[in-house]
From Swiss-Prot:
Protein name, UniProt field: Uncharacterized protein YjaZ
Encoding gene per record: yjaZ
InterPro entries documented for this protein: DUF2268
UniProt source species: Bacillus subtilis (strain 168)
Pfam families: DUF2268
Length: 261
């Protein structure tokens, strides 16, 4: 993995669009004309929207030693899971996004099989960043084991991936760094939510309007529904089989459902 020196990108940028020069090459086959779509995707997942605020935040991240910490974490995680070398792109989080502040603790991330984005506030502590990196890099490793094309990925595939990644955080740090949504529902409630809301739609794809509603708990759905159910399924399965999230990297999503029988 390589930690991109993004603070130098922002120092030279007059606008967010100027970051295209650095980010577009990370997306295989993408052209500069695709920048708006890529920008929108990154911002949808938590990237900053105000260039002046972004420059201030990234300067503080550098001053406080975040880049050095991220470099140490990358080596630890790569060794832990025998994972691939991927670029790590650290950028300011959108601190005006209320949902990211309240539900994700002013941090967010986005993982691909060949790269990883971290969106951070300069007010975070190193432990929070380690937890986020653990979650996102587990995604990178899991994606390397998936044989499906992105268009064929199901709701079940996704909630298991999210559950595994957050359980990796729990496995490493215990409750101290695990997301709050893992405590919002009792095991009994999660079993019922799986049977009533997730199971009937487990095979839907990302292009189905129900997908984000069930995954994130939007609209009238319980908050963080898919994430919480996925975490519960993974926890039950790994506990019963005395396995770790490293073992879980290659286990098919359907196999985890043995825990719900």
């Amino acid at each position: 993995m390589s930690v991109e020196q993004t603070y130098s990108w922002l120092r030279k940028a007059g606008s967010i669009d100027d970051l295209a020069h650095y980010i577009i090459p990370l997306f295989s086959g993408a052209e500069k004309k695709n920048w708006k779509g890529i920008l929108g995707h990154l911002q949808h997942h938590g990237m900053f929207k105000n260039i002046k605020e972004g420059i201030q935040t990234v300067s503080k991240l550098k001053e406080k030693g975040f880049y050095g910490h991220i470099q140490k974490e990358e080596q630890y995680l790569k060794n832990k899971w025998q994972g691939p070398d991927v670029p790590i792109v650290t950028l300011p989080v959108d601190e005006r996004n209320r949902r990211i502040r309240l539900e994700f603790g002013s941090k967010s991330g986005l993982a691909f099989q060949d790269k990883m984005f971290l969106f951070l506030s300069s007010d975070l502590d190193f432990g929070s960043v380690s937890a986020l990196m653990t979650h996102e890099y587990h995604h990178v490793c899991r994606l390397g084991h998936l044989t499906k094309e992105e268009k064929d990925v199901t709701l079940l595939d996704t909630i298991i991936m999210e559950g595994l990644a957050e359980y990796a955080v729990y496995e490493r740090f215990g409750r101290s760094q695990t997301a709050e949504w893992t405590t919002w529902y009792t095991p009994e409630q999660l079993q019922a939510l799986y049977e009533k809301k997730i199971a009937p739609h487990r095979d839907i794809k990302r292009d189905n309007r129900l997908f984000p509603q069930l995954l994130f708990g939007k609209g009238y759905q319980p908050k963080m529904l898919g994430y919480a159910v996925g975490f519960n399924i993974v926890k039950k399965y790994l506990t019963a089989s005395k396995a770790s999230t490293a073992d879980g990297l290659s286990i098919p999503a359907e196999t985890f459902l043995d825990a719900m029988l």
